[in-house]
Amino acid sequence: MQRMEEIAFKALNRVNNDRYLLANILFARIDELSKGAKPLVNMDVKKHKLTDIAMTEVAEGKIALSQIDQL
């Protein structure tokens, strides 16, 4: 598993270093995960923080802004 700093760096690169946009995407995805959505990455919800799961999903390109806009 990569360090969270590396994952956060990759996630920021995915959103063109827009921290505000990243925060909004993470908030929306964490809300989905807390309501029972399945993680799009191989991470156990019981072992990892929802923030870490959402950040990893963004870093790996599993979550796009267009998906969040549909909420």
Curated annotation (Swiss-Prot):
Enzyme class: transferase
Keyword terms, alphabetized: DNA-directed RNA polymerase, Nucleotidyltransferase, Transcription, Transferase
Keyword Transferase annotated: yes
Bilayer-crossing regions: none
Reactions this protein catalyses: RNA(n) + a ribonucleoside 5'-triphosphate = RNA(n+1) + diphosphate
EC id: 2.7.7.6
Keyword flag Nucleotidyltransferase: yes
Gene Ontology MF term list: DNA binding; DNA-directed RNA polymerase activity
Pfam families: RNA_pol_Rpb6 (PF01192)
A single GO BP: DNA-templated transcription
GO cellular component annotations of the record: DNA-directed RNA polymerase complex
SMART domains to which the protein is assigned, alphabetical: RNA_pol_Rpb6 (SM01409)
Record function comment: Promotes RNA polymerase assembly. Latches the N- and C-terminal regions of the beta' subunit thereby facilitating its interaction with the beta and alpha subunits.
Family indicated by similarity: Belongs to the RNA polymerase subunit omega family.
NCBIfam families on file: PRK00392.6-2
Subunit structure: The RNAP catalytic core consists of 2 alpha, 1 beta/beta' and 1 omega subunit. When a sigma factor is associated with the core the holoenzyme is formed, which can initiate transcription.
The protein, known as: DNA-directed RNA polymerase subunit omega
Organism: Wolinella succinogenes (strain ATCC 29543 / DSM 1740 / CCUG 13145 / JCM 31913 / LMG 7466 / NCTC 11488 / FDC 602W)
Gene: rpoZ
